[in-house]
Design a protein with these regions (language model features):
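Substrate-binding pocket helix/loop in short-chain dehydrogenase/reductase
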Residues: 72, 94, 100-114, 196, ...
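Alpha-helical segment proximal to the catalytic Tyr-Lys
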Residues: 130, 174-178, 235
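Conserved glycine-rich Rossmann-like NAD(P)H-binding loop of the short-chain dehydrogenase/reductase
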Residues: 32-47
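Short, small/polar-rich loop/turn modules that mediate ligand/substrate recognition or access, typified
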Residues: 177, 182, 237-239, 245
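Active-site helix of classical SDR
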Residues: 125, 161, 169
Length: 251
């Protein structure tokens, strides 16, 4: 079954590279209009813009820091002006995620995690909800992580922030359901993308050995789940988490 997103506008944060780009392109190829956004790397943003355009996606380029209210407003204002009202939202932007013993973290790092995974989704949803409420239709798809479900260590800052994001998403799913707005989560496993190129091979081999399906996940695996959750066919699905990790969390 091919899911159609024609007539929709999807904001996917951090969609100039990695999982975000795969999700953005997949939503666009399903028919949605998708702005490309970047925080600092304009060259990468422009390269991604060309890739979206070559895929036949109606798009535009926006620079914005989605951990700030001003940045979120700039992204939505540009998207609304150039593409139309936003009714699909995928908070995906992330920061570095180093494994460290808790004694080696400081609060500033914990705060950066909370900014990306709780503050940013909150600001994005608050800005986007008026249009969704007017339409009585909307999709919010939070990109969480298997780390919360697996209690991965030493990774406390990331696990804590993702746990908060999951709780927020579940609560929002109940609050927004009467308005035809669904809130769901995709929890990827370790999906190697550009920023993992220098990760130690021994760590990669150890993780791969734990995956029941015996292969690495690829960005398309995550993107396909996002297209489904954004579709009409997922209209009666809300408050749910799809773990896309080859069977690492069988519950």
């Amino acid at each position: 079954m091919a899911f159609s997103l024609k007539g929709h506008v999807a904001v996917v944060t951090g969609n100039s590279a990695g999982l975000g780009k795969a999700i953005g392109v997949a939503l666009g190829q399903a028919g949605a209009k998708v702005p490309v956004n970047f925080a600092h790397n304009e060259a990468r943003g422009r390269w991604a813009l060309e890739e979206y355009q070559q895929a036949g996606i109606e798009t535009c380029l926006v620079q914005s820091d989605v951990t700030t209210e001003e940045g979120v407003d700039a992204l939505f204002t540009a998207a609304e002006k150039q593409l139309g009202p936003v009714d699909i939202l995928v908070p995906n932007a992330t920061c570095d995620q180093p494994h460290r013993p808790i004694e080696e973290y400081d609060w500033a790092f914990y705060q950066s995690m909370l900014d990306f995974f709780i503050k940013s989704p909150f600001l994005l949803a608050r800005r986007g909800l008026p249009a969704m409420r007017r339409k009585k239709w909307g999709r919010i798809i939070n990109i969480t992580s298997e780390v919360f479900h697996r209690s991965v260590a030493p990774f406390s800052a990331y696990v804590a922030a993702k746990g908060g994001q999951i709780g927020w998403s579940r609560s929002m799913s109940q609050e927004l359901a009467p308005f035809g707005i669904t809130v769901n989560m995709i929890a990827p496993g370790w999906i190697p993308v550009e920023r993992h190129e220098k990760d130690p091979q021994a760590e990669k081999d150890a993780y791969l050995s734990l995956i029941p399906m015996g292969r690495w996940g690829v960005p398309k695996d995550i993107a396909d789940a996002a297209v489904y959750l954004a579709s009409e066919e997922a209209g009666f699905v809300t408050g749910q988490t799809i773990c896309v990790n080859g069977g690492m969390t069988p519950w």
